[in-house]
Structures are given as structure tokens and as C-alpha cells.
């Protein structure tokens, strides 16, 4: 069983339209919302060894290390919201042939840990997967360069690329 987890309905909409039979859950934005959603799914018995959770959404690219519009698989998440002494890294094995990248969950500094992209949910997914024993896959489409003004973000383009990529691996 595959559960597709999206932070927002906006991120899910193109894939939902293209694949209405998919099990799609909207987690809400951020680490706490993602943890609460995964805990609820676990409590309902919907997670486990036979389940894969695919977290999909947009991400920002540090310094253009990944081009806007590109879709990547996150293989390593670094929780950098805490002081550097408490940074925590979570990794998974590749599940696709997409380019694998390192991501920060919530922005701090690219020099701090060499991340290529950032998002707000990924480290939670990987930590919960280790704790609860389900397979985690994170697919992100780059919508912007970190730090650029919101009006320059190319969200529509990124979401179309994300949906097309998810259809290849469903």
C-alpha cells in the first residue's frame, strides 16, 4: 500500500486530478503537523512494514544547486532548526532513479550541512519511519531559490513536474 502525503491541498491537486484512485492525505505544513498526521495513521493501523509513505511537495533550492522545476528524491534530511550541536540527520535508501539530494528541514545555512534543498516536513517523515517501521520516500519539486521573493517562485511549474514524476513511480 502506498500513502501519498502532501503538506497542502495545493501541492496535491495536480496529482489528485491525474490519479484519483491514489490514497492522498493532507498533513498540513511543518514538522508538528506531519508528526501528528503520521501518528494518527499509525494509531489507525495504516502504517507498518507493508506500507510506503511518499511525502511529496515543493522545495527551495540553495543557490541554484538544483534548478527550479527539477524533481528530486531526498535521500538525507538534516534537522537544523536546533543549535548546531543538536543537528540530527536521517537517511533512507533510494527508491527511484531521480537525482538524490540532501535537504534541510527548515532553513538555517547551506554551509552548516551542505544541503541542496530545503523543506519543512522531511526530517519528521524519516524519523517517524525509523521509529514506526514503515518505508519512507520523499519527492520534491523545486519551486524557488531559497531567499528569493515569493512573487518569483514558480509553484505551478513545480507542481506539474511533481505530478508527472509521481505518475511514473505510482
Regions flagged by a language model, labelled:
Residues 1-3:
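Extreme N-terminal starter segment of soluble prokaryotic enzymes
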Residues 9-170:
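Glycine-rich phosphate- or other oxyanion-binding loops that anchor nucleotides, phosphorylated ligands
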Amino acid at each position: 500500500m502506498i500513502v501519498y502525503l502532501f503538506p497542502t491541498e495545493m501541492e496535491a491537486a495536480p496529482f489528485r486530478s491525474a490519479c484519483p484512485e491514489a490514497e492522498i492525505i493532507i498533513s498540513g505544513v511543518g514538522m508538528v503537523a506531519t508528526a501528528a498526521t503520521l501518528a494518527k495513521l499509525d494509531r489507525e493501523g495504516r502504517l507498518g512494514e507493508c506500507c510506503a509513505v511518499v511525502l511529496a511537495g515543493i522545495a527551495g533550492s540553495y543557490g541554484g544547486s538544483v534548478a527550479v522545476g527539477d524533481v528530486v528524491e531526498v535521500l538525507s534530511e538534516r534537522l537544523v532548526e536546533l543549535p548546531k550541536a543538536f543537528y540530527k540527520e536521517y537517511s533512507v535508501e533510494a527508491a527511484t532513479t531521480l537525482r538524490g539530494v540532501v535537504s534541510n528541514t527548515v532553513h538555517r545555512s547551506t554551509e552548516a550541512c551542505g544541503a541542496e534543498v530545503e523543506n519543512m516536513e522531511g526530517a519528521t517523515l524519516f524519523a517517524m519511519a525509523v521509529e514506526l517501521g514503515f518505508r519512507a520516500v520523499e519527492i520534491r519539486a523545486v519551486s524557488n531559490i531559497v531567499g528569493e521573493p515569493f512573487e518569483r517562485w514558480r509553484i505551478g511549474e513545480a507542481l506539474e513536474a511533481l505530478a508527472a514524476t509521481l505518475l511514473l513511480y505510482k
